[in-house]
């Protein structure tokens, strides 16, 4: 599947989006990112098919679902999210919020759907399919554009009658240009501003960004609940015309993803190359004390190349600093 995917991506040359800048704080080259994505997709498929636990597949799907649900107010813990993934059940005996469980179960299925459809180009109908996967059994009409107005704080979103044409235009413009992180981030901001569905827009938008990174051979990123304030502030800054903050945030989350996944890659040589480029030491075992920490160097030190002016992102096990303009 991966070879077919990259043949599709490289078979037709697309022009660079003139709005893209040349700036980047990403310490990993495009070639190394592409190698990572190839290895990650292949290992995810193998672990998923073989039912192998505690690998890159389980780690990434639990992090993806837990964080993107938590951001939206889910009360489920990471342990409960993992239980839903392992059992694929929509009922948890210790949960008082069955709606959260249903959406979490749907979210795990949606994650699999993203991988199963990597060879499909992004279209309005495909976006509706993602929403259907997420909101089936939760909404009366999942997978359909909104018919009533909605809002996101002070952000003015599209009117229902405007949604079809705006999404068509957005997707057409996105597919016109060669894939880049900046193009993906730009799509994400515009999609969230349109807010085409009654509910689930944030989760669908972040799912699209994750998938499109994989399709482009770029390291994907997960928006963590711990960093959501920086994420939302960066979205607002992007809408106001300052694009660098959100792009730097996405790059920091890309590094966070690699830092978590790289030590588990079956390709040890690639794993060492990735960790070496980031200045992160490989985790070590002690025969009398078990596993000892992810690294003696924090992700903060590995991200010295990401220039910052003071905003902090806290993750479960590390602290990042990203540029805020």
Residue ranges and their predicted role:
Residues 1-199, 203-325:
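FIC/Doc superfamily catalytic core
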């Amino acid at each position: 599947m991966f070879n077919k995917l990259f043949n599709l991506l490289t078979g037709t040359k697309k022009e660079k989006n003139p709005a893209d800048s040349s700036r980047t704080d990403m310490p990993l080259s495009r070639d190394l990112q592409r190698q990572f994505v190839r290895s990650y997709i292949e290992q995810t498929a193998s672990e998923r098919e073989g039912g192998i636990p505690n690998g890159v597949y389980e780690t990434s799907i639990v992090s993806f679902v837990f964080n993107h649900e938590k951001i939206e107010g889910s009360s489920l813990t990471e342990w409960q999210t993992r239980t839903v993934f392992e059992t694929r059940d929509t009922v948890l005996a210790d949960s008082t919020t069955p709606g959260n469980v249903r959406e979490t179960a749907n979210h795990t299925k949606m994650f699999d759907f993203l991988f199963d459809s990597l060879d499909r180009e992004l279209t309005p109908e495909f976006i509706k399919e993602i929403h259907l996967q997420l909101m089936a059994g939760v909404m009366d009409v999942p997978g359909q554009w909104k018919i009533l107005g909605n809002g996101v704080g002070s952000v003015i979103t599209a009117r229902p009658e405007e949604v079809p044409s705006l999404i068509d235009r957005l997707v057409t413009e996105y597919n016109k240009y060669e894939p880049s992180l900046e193009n993906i981030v730009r799509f994400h901001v515009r999609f969230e501003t349109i807010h085409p569905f009654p509910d689930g827009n944030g989760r669908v938008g972040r799912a699209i960004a994750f998938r499109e990174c994989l399709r482009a051979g770029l390291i994907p990123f997960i928006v963590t609940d711990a960093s959501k304030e920086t994420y939302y502030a960066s979205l607002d800054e992007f809408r106001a015309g300052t694009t660098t903050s959100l792009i730097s945030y996405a790059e920091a989350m890309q590094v966070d993803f690699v830092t978590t996944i790289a030590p588990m890659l079956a390709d040890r040589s690639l794993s060492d190359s990735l960790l070496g480029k980031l200045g992160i030491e490989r985790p070590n075992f002690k025969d009398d004390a078990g596993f000892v920490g992810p690294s003696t160097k924090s992700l903060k030190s590995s991200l010295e190349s990401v220039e910052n002016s003071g905003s902090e992102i806290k993750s479960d096990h590390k602290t990042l600093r990203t540029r805020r303009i």
